[in-house]
């Protein structure tokens, strides 16, 4: 009898396979989406997998499919009376609400997002969405003057984007022979990384159709430039560009270990251009160009 029970549980889910799939979401979302689709076909009663799958679809921009998966998973879960009467159903609803909030953010429906955050303070605290509450408030134009001076870098950029502020913020990711840099920063570009040229090409190549949507207010793009820098003490040929959602306003740029399995834009053609005889450090060139 016990064996039959175990056999039945395996028909509903596979915790090992599910865990393996979740582990590749950040590094290879396209493969994760494909694998989750196959997983759901094998285990259609694993309702949480629909939420994970929908989140990935949002990340890669397949919005209609994400909406269909959310609807299908919700309907199947609600049709199962045993599941609805279990403690897991409450957890399922919380996960469902999270992906629905992300959907609101993707569609820039910030008013509904803000109203939900205001009306559900306990859920906001439990799911650590205080930043999302503030950001949605900013997007709705409800921030007051007393709060402006206290805004974090990201919040202030959402409120009123300033490229000079971005350039100053970016210095922590640039190495220099003549000045120290914060060794606590996990991702740093190499000294010979041509930041100015690369930034120009980034602006020229950013295409909203190629974005990845992470979190609630940010888009992410991946670029390749061989030997660009290091991330977590490992050399890498890729870097990430984070922008405010659905805009070309750049929040930060940093080397990444995750670009290999994402759609990325190759900027190695810059390497073929003539290099100056006398090399200046990144920060030297940076200051020469942007110094007031």
Label the predicted regions.
Residues 31-39, 65-76, 109-122, 144-155:
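Alpha-helical repeat scaffolds
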Residues 50, 84, 97, 130-131:
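Canonical tetratricopeptide repeat
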Residues 135-292:
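Ribonuclease/tRNase effector modules and their secretory precursors
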Residues 26-27, 60, 107, 140-142:
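Structural motif corresponding to the intra-repeat A-B loop/turn of tetratricopeptide repeats
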Residues 9-38, 42:
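Alpha-helical segment of the N-proximal tetratricopeptide repeat
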